[in-house]
Amino acid sequence: MVQTKICGLKTPEGVTAALDGGAAFIGFNMFPASPRYISAEDAARLAPPARGRTRIVAVTVDPDDAFLDRLMTSLRPDLIQLHGRETPTRAAAIAARTGAEVIKALPVSDASDVDTAAPFDAAVTHLMFDAKAPAGAAFPGGHGVAFDWSVLKGRRFSRPWFLAGGLDPWNVAEAIGGAGAPMVDVSSGVERGPGIKDPALISAFLEAVRRA
């Protein structure tokens, strides 16, 4: 069964919709430039209903050690997603410092970008293939942009992986088939405005994944 991560949650209603729909992961975006930004402390206040029902992911961009220490004291996520320019060495150091599992997000525009995953095999527990952000974008991910899913079809990776980028309730089944994805990640595709999650769209997305 394909697993789903609902990312960029900011409200109790969004968290509830994700939990009720059976999301395997929920994500809180810690990057201040994103319209989905939430502080670690505010995310910690939303997290209690999720513990034991799903896995909590902190989405970060080039986090420093001081931030990581604060994150592990407040939110205590199960996984840390790295969505910046982190190297395999830095990713491994983050895993060792925090004790959390680590997702490395990799920007993709064509098949050659998929090959950038290999150096992270020994450093992280999960991979994510996300559409490359538009030129000049202030933040990575969450732009509602897709890439050619077929560049992932038939590829084998040593780590579990997520497909992300431009997914929504209407195209996720096609995306899963086109990429052969074992896990999917959605953010802007379940919003009614930038950073504003729609519980009905969250439910529809999770149902579409179940039916895929």
In which residue ranges do the predicted regions lie?
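Conserved N-terminal beta1-alpha1 strand-loop-helix module at the mouth
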Residues: M1-M183, S188-A212
